[in-house]
């Protein structure tokens, strides 16, 4: 994961949408860690592990008005690669929610939206969904507060490991967050 170029206006828009999503599901103050599956469930999604190939992290399917996706009684489904670590699974769920919040309206075809995430594919939408996930799981103010509370003598790697454990996200996501927020 490396940081990507995005306009400040786009970043602000995504940050606001992530904060609005947390507020919509009832979070007044963001807990650490965010219960991302509860967030997804509150937005109407069923979430589960899926048998996917190694290069596929997850997928999202939305079929408005239908209540059957792959035999599951739902019109919104997020599937995550069952082989990923718990921290990565959390990030994948948040990433797929990012696709829904940010891209559903522009990409839905007659109420149907399906998207599969390949590890090798990184484009503007993927980067935006990653940024949404980071803001949902590690909101700027909360992340900065926790980062600033760490002892100064700790190195970048140690800080990343501690914050990854606290936010229950992959260490790579924390390192990318360092870059996004220009901390250190």
Located regions from the model:
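Active-site hotspot residues in diverse enzymes, especially metal/ion-binding acidic/histidine motifs
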Residues: 1-184
